[in-house]
Structures are given as structure tokens and as C-alpha cells.
């Protein structure tokens, strides 16, 4: 195995300037921001932007293994600015080639692209501000970039570690949020990966998601085929709102509930996608946001990028399934959680994913389509497909896959009511 590489360098990125933060305190007790408090003291607010673009130098930290390459920008909130799939030679999160802020964030400036980490509320107050960082090497050849800060509104501390391991085609993210105060504090955590929009985009929600909510659960729609009115759009003819091209206005939707640990997006015109994996018991939030496939959405595209086109926000919530919704930290309490972001290819719309593998099993005009994509090495495994209630397997083959590779096929001439697909090895079932 090749050890993970980590390095620091200055990178030059075309950047649009902002005005200065207001030096005067703003006691905005009655300000409402995205359904929650807009009070930001002791932070200052920036309310001016510039059309002046310069080539600006930014501190970047890179992680790279045999499968993916990731760039983190500590000077912009510690966000993942770029994530590159080395196997498919594609950005598996939306890469904005310019830093072009708009007044979207809690303190004003906010940029699209990459993976943003929203806390203690969204959009993160320090999303356009620097954070501390350090590097950690592991005995197994893995490398971690830690970023962290103490935010000033609630006095909470956060540390987030971005880890690549030599034998895994996934970015592992481990976070710790600590309340060092003598009284309870509240916070939320929504990771916000951006993915490419356009005609080829389709969101990949788990198969048990049949309904989605708006913010505050104030409106509901069937999913993926909407059949009523949602965001004042008439979908009564039956419209697949998992497709970017079918959503004409700015729209949020969040899964009502799911027993699955994944959510993602598939790009039909690139044969590649992104998946997020986390324990659904603590990470139930699964959301899509779009500016809409219309002139209004195109205007926002131009406000946030020069040439990279539309994007989708595919937000993933910890301790919350809707926005705004908060969890509590008791005095001196710490909460920890893990998330995984990974590229995949070949399988298209998938039905399950874990930290080690991605599964496809669906009916189509071709028959029963099945597939398996490896995130970690799958050697000495078997893949079995069975009809529930019957002993004989419809498929039972040996599997030997290296990370970032896939196998797939079609079962013809059968029409079972319910099927199971299970990869397993000497150590048991895949996690």
C-alpha cells in the first residue's frame, strides 16, 4: 500500500473581494435568519461586495491516496474546496474555479462549491473566516488534517479531522463539539457538499424515502414523484423532483425519515456520483437544495461563479432531520460523530451504501439489475442474491474487488416479489 501524502502550499485562485466587517457591534435581537436567530454579536457583519477580481494566494492543505485527492482551505472556514476522483478523473464535489461570495451567510459573505460544514447554525458564521489547523500522521500510513475553532457567539469549540487511509476510496471526517461553559448551549451540524447541477443531475435518496418536508416541516411532498403542489409549483401530473431539470424554483426538501445510512447524487452525463455515509441514528438529515432550473436560478449561478454553472446543495444533518433544528450540549459535554464522503462510478442510481461498499439492486426493463462497488478491499467475499423466503440463491459468486472498482450484471427471466443482496466474507457481512 502506498502511504497517504499530505502537504501544504499556497494556491492562487481568482477571488472577488468583499468589504470590511462592520467594526460596530450589531445587537440584532429581532433579526431572523433562515428560520432561526440572526443575532451575531460579537461578530461583525459584512454587507458590501466588490466586482473586482484578483488572483489571490490562499493557504491550502492537500491529502492524496491512490484513489482521491482533496484540498482543504483553512482560511475559508476549513472547507473542502476540491475533491478529485483519480479513477474517473472528475471532481466528485462541485468545484468552483473562482471564489465569488454573495451575501448569503449569517455574517454576509458565502461561497458555493466544495463541502461546507455548518455549525453552530447555518450558514456557518465563520464560513468566510480562517480557522486553526494541524496535521497528524498514523502508523498505518493514513494522514489527518485537523481544523478547529472556538466560535464567539456561544463559546463552543469544534475540531474536525479529515482523514485519508491508504486502502480506502473515501474521505473520513471525524468531528468533536465541546461546550466549555458552565451552562447548556445549543448547536446544529449540517455538512453541505455541493454537486454539479444541470440536465444530468439526479439526487440519490434511500429507497424508503417516500415523502419529503420543507423547512420546519411546514409542507410535504411525495418523493421522488411529486403529485401535488410544492413551493407553489403544480406537480399534479407526476414529476420526478430528484432531477434538477424538473425543479423550476428555489426549493428545499428533506427526507421525512429513513432507516438507511446514505444519501447522494448521480451525474448521468459523467457516469459518476457522490455518496455520504453516516449512522442514521445520529445523522438522520438528508436534504437537497436548488436555486431552481429557471432564469432566477441562472441569475444566482452567475452571482456565485463565472463559468462553472449550476450546482445542488446536498446537505446532511447530524442530530437533526430538518432545519432549523438544534441539539443541546450540557455544561462541559462533548459530542463526537463520523461522516464519510466518497465517489463512485458505473452503478448509477444505487439502493444502499456503507463505509465499505455500495449496492445496486433494482428492477428495470432489462431485468433485475445488480451491482457492487468497493470502497475498501473486498477479497475472499461472496455476493448472493436471494428471493425472500426461498433457500436457493439466484446468484452466488465469488468477489475480489480493489477499492474504487465495481462489478454489475442483470438477472433475466425472473419476477420475484422481494429480493435480498448480501456481500459477505470470512469476517461476516460487510458493515
Annotate the PLM regions:
Residues 2-5, 9-26, 61, 68-71, ...:
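A contiguous, surface-exposed recognition patch within enzymatic or periplasmic domains that forms
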Residues 26-64, 112-169, 199, 298-327, ...:
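Extended, loop-rich substrate-binding clefts of extracytoplasmic carbohydrate-active enzymes
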Residues 176-183, 372-374:
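Asparagine-centered strand-capping/turn motif at beta-strand->loop junctions
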Residues 183-189, 350-351, 380-384:
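Short, hydrophobic/aromatic beta-strand segments
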Residues 347-378:
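Surface beta-strand/loop "capping" patches
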Residues 367-397, 419-421:
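Beta-strand-rich binding/interaction modules
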Residues 383-384, 412-430:
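Short, aromatic- and glycine-rich surface loops/edge beta-strands on solvent-exposed regions
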Residues 396, 403-413:
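Exposed aromatic-hydrophobic patches
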Amino acid at each position: 500500500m502506498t502511504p497517504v501524502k499530505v502537504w501544504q502550499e499556497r494556491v492562487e485562485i481568482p477571488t472577488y473581494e468583499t468589504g470590511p466587517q462592520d467594526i460596530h457591534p450589531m445587537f440584532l435581537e429581532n433579526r431572523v435568519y433562515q428560520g432561526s436567530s440572526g443575532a451575531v454579536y460579537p461578530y461583525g457583519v459584512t454587507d458590501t461586495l466588490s466586482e473586482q477580481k484578483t488572483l489571490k494566494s490562499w493557504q491550502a492543505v492537500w491529502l492524496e491516496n491512490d484513489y482521491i485527492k482533496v484540498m482543504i482551505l483553512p482560511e475559508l472556514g476549513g472547507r473542502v474546496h476540491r475533491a478529485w476522483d483519480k479513477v474517473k478523473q472528475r471532481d466528485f464535489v462541485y468545484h468552483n474555479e473562482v471564489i465569488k461570495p454573495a451575501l448569503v451567510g449569517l455574517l454576509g459573505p458565502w461561497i458555493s462549491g466544495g463541502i461546507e460544514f455548518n455549525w453552530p447554525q447555518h450558514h456557518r458564521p465563520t464560513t468566510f473566516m480562517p480557522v486553526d489547523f494541524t496535521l497528524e500522521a498514523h502508523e498505518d500510513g493514513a494522514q489527518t488534517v485537523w481544523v478547529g475553532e472556538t466560535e464567539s457567539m456561544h463559546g463552543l469549540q469544534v475540531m474536525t479531522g479529515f482523514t485519508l487511509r491508504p486502502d480506502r476510496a473515501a474521505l473520513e471526517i471525524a468531528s468533536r463539539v465541546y461546550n466549555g461553559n458552565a451552562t447548556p448551549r445549543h448547536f446544529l451540524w449540517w455538512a453541505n457538499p455541493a454537486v454539479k447541477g444541470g440536465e444530468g443531475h439526479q439526487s440519490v435518496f434511500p429507497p424508503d424515502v417516500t415523502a419529503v418536508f420543507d423547512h420546519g416541516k411546514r409542507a410535504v411532498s411525495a418523493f421522488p414523484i411529486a403529485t401535488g403542489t410544492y413551493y407553489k409549483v403544480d406537480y399534479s401530473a407526476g414529476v420526478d423532483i430528484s432531477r434538477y431539470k424538473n425543479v423550476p424554483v428555489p426549493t428545499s426538501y428533506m427526507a421525512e425519515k429513513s432507516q438507511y445510512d446514505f444519501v447522494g447524487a448521480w451525474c448521468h452525463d459523467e457516469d459518476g456520483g457522490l455518496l455520504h455515509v453516516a449512522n442514521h441514528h445520529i445523522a438522520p438529515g438528508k436534504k437537497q437544495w436548488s436555486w431552481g432550473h429557471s432564469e432566477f436560478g441562472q441569475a444566482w449561478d452567475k452571482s456565485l461563479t463565472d463559468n462553472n454553472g449550476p450546482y445542488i446543495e446536498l446537505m446532511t444533518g447530524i442530530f437533526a432531520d430538518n432545519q432549523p433544528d438544534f441539539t443541546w450540549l450540557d455544561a462541559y459535554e462533548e459530542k463526537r460523530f463520523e461522516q464519510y464522503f466518497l465517489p463512485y462510478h458505473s452503478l448509477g442510481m444505487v439502493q444502499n451504501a456503507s463505509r465499505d461498499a455500495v449496492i445496486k439492486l433494482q428492477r428495470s426493463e432489462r431485468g433485475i439489475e445488480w451491482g457492487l462497488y468497493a470502497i475498501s478491499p473486498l477479497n475472499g467475499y461472496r455476493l448472493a442474491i436471494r428471493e425472500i423466503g426461498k433457500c436457493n440463491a439466484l446468484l452466488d459468486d465469488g468477489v475480489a474487488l480493489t477499492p474504487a472498482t465495481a462489478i454489475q450484471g442483470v438477472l433475466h427471466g425472473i419476477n420475484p416479489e422481494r429480493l435480498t443482496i448480501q456481500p459477505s466474507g470470512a469476517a461476516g457481512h460487510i458493515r
